[in-house]
Amino acid sequence: RWLTEKWRQRSIVGDSGFPSTTASALASLTTGQVPGEHGIVGYTIRDPSSGVLINHLKDWEPHVNPAHWQRSDTIFEKARAVGIPSLSMGERRFAGTGFTQAVWRGATFVGTDSLDEQFTTLRKFFDENDQGVAYLYWPALDRTGHSLVWV
């Protein structure tokens, strides 16, 4: 909480956007767009073409094509376009999901099951690349934020 006060004193604003859900916020983080632009506007949304409810954090198949659902370029795609490699990491169970394909598109996804594994992979990535973009997602940190309802 002390950091929030320090930021306030320096007029630094941190905003996860609205709605403040993991799905919307992560898509905004990786695209630089607000939910109304990237299309992931909440945890669950009804697909207007099929009427099916889509839970953004579950697998979307066969109802939604991730490339069509989330159309904004990601930071990883922008980096790749100028020759900069990208890495994204999360739990192994996220590999190949619609959300991973939509939000981390353009990055090489590596599934990991521990923070040690993430940091080892991160170190290897930067040992092999002079520059790059890397994103690490650790769900326990996300869950802690939700459970403490820290504002």
Residue map of PLM features:
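Short, intrinsically disordered, charge-balanced linker/junction segments flanking boundaries
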Residues: 147-151
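His/Asp/Glu-rich, glycine-adjacent segments
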Residues: 2-132, 137-146
